[in-house]
């Protein structure tokens, strides 16, 4: 009998800081369970309008300038706990001209019409650009830039983004989120066969592992993951960028073990470091293109 897979569905928003903080957990799930798991996303629309939004605990909402200052402080505080990089300097996500996070949600739905894998890479880039690069990701210019980076067809993306089709798909996501009462993000729906469980808020990998074992009655087990340089390099190549905490979590590495592997890969020039706010990302080293000026042909 074919083994069932577990589905982990995240109710999310591209600019949600604890969704950003959950990236190490989701990547660890994908690494430890491999083909036994499928992750997907439902857009929840965190901020319809900053002027009518209000988070009393963090004093976010109303005036965009004050909100941006407090969001940056909140994200920095969260970063100390979840470990993902955040850039507070120059943070101006919301303004009179850009009062909502709905454009990012709709953009993800537009990307989904083309390719699920590229759409998820696009979602990751929106998270990185919002949290670690302090870019105003609600603008069409930035969204097109990010869509191009992940290989989406820009003409189709822009058409789907603006013709109402993606907005309709987003409205469907909002309805699904309301049916599951996913009002805070992240929230997770974990499904295995005809059984399911909702998790609300940030949760550790250990929590997910326990729930997967419970839902599958122990049938789904972690794969054997080698904790070595080759495996870490494969992980970085697969995801195209990884924060240190993502590597350490996925491979259960101590700080010392991680630093040893990182130092070796940097010395061998297998990877590069890219500074990002209060942290950095590890990227695969890409061989530069060489172009023949006569033929116009470029190759690596």
PLM segments and residue spans:
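C-terminal cap of thioredoxin/glutaredoxin-like
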Residues: 10-11, 15, 23-31, 128-300
